[in-house]
Amino acid sequence: MRTTPLVFTELDSGRNGYTVTWTAEPGGRVELSGGVVVTGWRPAEHGRWVATVPDAVLTPRQLYVNGLRASWARSDWLEHEDCKIGPEGMTGAGALGVAAYGRPSDVELVFRVRWRDYHCRITDISDDLIRFAEPCWTNALPGTGRVGPHWDNTAVGTEIHSWSMFASNALESLTEPGHFVWNSDARTVTYLPRDGEDMESAEVIVPVAEQLVVVDGAHDLVLKGLSFAHTAWHRSDGYVGAQAGFTLTGASGPLGEAGSHYTKPVAALTVRGGRRVTVSGCEFVRLGGAGAVFEAGTKDSTVTASTFADVSSGGLYVGGIDPHPTAEAADEGNTVSFNTFHGTGAEYTDSVAIWAGYTRNLTIERNTLEHLPYSGISIGWGWNQPEAQDPWLGGNRIAGNRITDVLRVAERQYDGGAIYTQGPQPGTVIEANYINRSEYGTTANDGNGIYLDEQSSHILVTGNVVTRVGYKWVSNWAEYGVENRAAGNWTDNTITPAFSGAGSVMEDNAEGLSELPPEAVRVAEQAGAGPWPGPVEALGNHGP
């Protein structure tokens, strides 16, 4: 187990045309793990098992039992119509059933509002009032002055949009195998095993370390065939989701209408200011935060042929949230190709598989993204705010990706897209992607195929196959999202797209199809990380 990250600096770089490669010896395997083994399991009532966790563990949010994630026990969705929300907390402890919990101060309430996700810990219950830990609760409410007035309608307790809520980590909810509860006083975990799990012989790992590897200013470096596993994310300020896995942290701070003051999730691998750094054939699995972050002036670097699976937050983050970085801090010329993203956002469901902020000449090509709670690929930032005009953004290419089963209705995260964009991006192209099942099963919650949101401008959308989308196959709703063009795409969708921006055009798109033509089938078959030809779901199948 690593308790501190392995750090590569400029001194660890390749020289004189050579590259330094870190990989397993032939026939070997290297796993970088941030977890410790939990032993001493003893039986308890109702088929549960209990163990004391090692002292190094802070708050365990995940266990891995023989390699399978175990999450905190959770309640059903809670009816909250009679709850009153204010600065002191939320009423309804009795009606929600929370007042009956034996250890309410270990319980978190999780709120889902449109594209935002919130996790705030209960501190105490007084009569019918539930109080929460700070700064999480204050940051979750409207009127913080830190997210801009237009975002208050997606704060906890909004009366404008519907929202959902459940409780997690209550022993009273531990009824489903594969889940557990943490008792902070006794420092024990109580687990309900799955069928066939023998807790006297099972390997149980709990995450401790937040980061495994940091590449800080290194160049000409290759990480090949490594496995990154079992990281934690302590998030001491709670979790107040802003967008795409970014959070609002701290008790105070500057106004962030353009999103330039939000906090990126902690990642197993962080590359800062890297040049020609390659991550190839690696696994990012069983993680409590994000998979990897490339930021702070990382250029000409690549993530390829790697797997991101069972990750609590987002899979991969490229770029930053400063619209006008210095030349040294600007991210440019990076490539994300032939990777597989499966089941990211396992805990923080507002996160995305691939996020790119302010970046230029980024290629996101031939990746497979599947089974995701919210958007698949998100590129751009800034909305329509004055400070986000003329940003470091453009020349990006999103091509040949296979994106299936995203914006899953059961997760109750809304207003996104399989491919989502923000901001003016001259020269950006979205082409030859296969999108199938994006918030499929409802037309009520703004689940799009390709979503050119807010000030998305100067983007070409061409040659894509978009099927089984809950709302629009392509959306450019804002009049200030200008000069976009959607041409030569195929879809079964019949909901009229909103291309409202000045100079935006739609032409030669095949809509309302009952059968994909051969050319569209070929595009869909060749999308993704392989093998090829990939499966293409025939139109007319409207099952789950």
Please report, for each region that a protein language model flagged, where it lies by residue.
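Extracellular beta-strand/beta-solenoid scaffold signature
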Residues: 3, 7-8, 43-50, 206-212, ...
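Right-handed parallel beta-helix
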Residues: 219-230, 275-289, 298-313, 326-345, ...
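Extracellular polysaccharide-degrading/modifying enzymes targeting complex plant/algal/animal polysaccharides
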Residues: 1-273, 278, 324-325, 529, ...
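Extracellular beta-rich repeat passengers
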Residues: 234, 444-532
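Extracellular beta-strand solenoid repeats
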Residues: 7, 21-23, 31-33, 214, ...
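An acidic- and aromatic-residue-enriched active-site/binding cleft used to recognize and process polar
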Residues: 11, 25-27, 37, 125-127, ...
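The right-handed parallel beta-helix/beta-solenoid scaffold, focusing on the short coil/turn
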Residues: 4, 18-20, 28, 61, ...
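Active-site proximal loops enriched in glycine and acidic residues that flank catalytic Cys/His/Asp
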Residues: 193, 273, 296, 320, ...
